Amino acid sequence: MKPWLTFGRRLGMTLAYRTLNAVARITGSGGLGVKALVVTPGGRIVLVRHSYMAGWHFPGGGLKRGETPEQGIIRELREEIGLVSWTTIGQSDEPNDNADPNCTGPALFIVTGADYRFRANLEIEATSEFSPEALPQDCPQSVQRHVAWWQAGKALAL
């Protein structure tokens, strides 16, 4: 892809994301959001790199009108990482400390045995798998804390 096109796409997505966040903060209109700690059959953690913000994050996003959190996380994982199949999926009992004003509420899911086929798109530039003991330096503290919590066996039995 041409560098100027990549830059333009990233700039457009960043501006759209920041505008949405500003509107949500001002109006208090943020809705329920979902995100997932996705674990491969080999025990590696799947993280995504967005086109509009730095660092590695859990996949997820906002719910559509009338969508349950379970439906929303499956849709988001199919859109963001190309989720094909999984062994277990369930909502955790740990609160979601999502700082995104568009996505509030305790909707952190644990997905195990995840098989996926990623294709880059406007929102997600890359996915990568990481050892739970060797998460990237540029992932939020909340991701590190959720992974440590999961490793400690505090996750809801699925």
Predicted regions and their residues:
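Acidic, metal-coordinating catalytic segment for phosphate/diphosphate chemistry
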Residues: 1-35
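Conserved hydrophobic "DFG−1" position in protein kinase catalytic cores
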Residues: 38-39, 47, 111, 129
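Conserved Nudix-box catalytic region and its N-terminal flanking loop in Nudix hydrolases
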Residues: 40-79
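Nudix hydrolase/Nudix homology domain
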Residues: 54-55, 120-158
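Glycine-centered C-terminal helix-capping/turn motifs at helix ends
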Residues: 82-83, 129
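A short coil-to-beta-strand element that immediately follows conserved catalytic motifs
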Residues: 84-93
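Active-site-adjacent beta-strand/loop module that shapes the phosphate/pyrophosphate-binding cleft
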Residues: 94-118, 128, 146-150
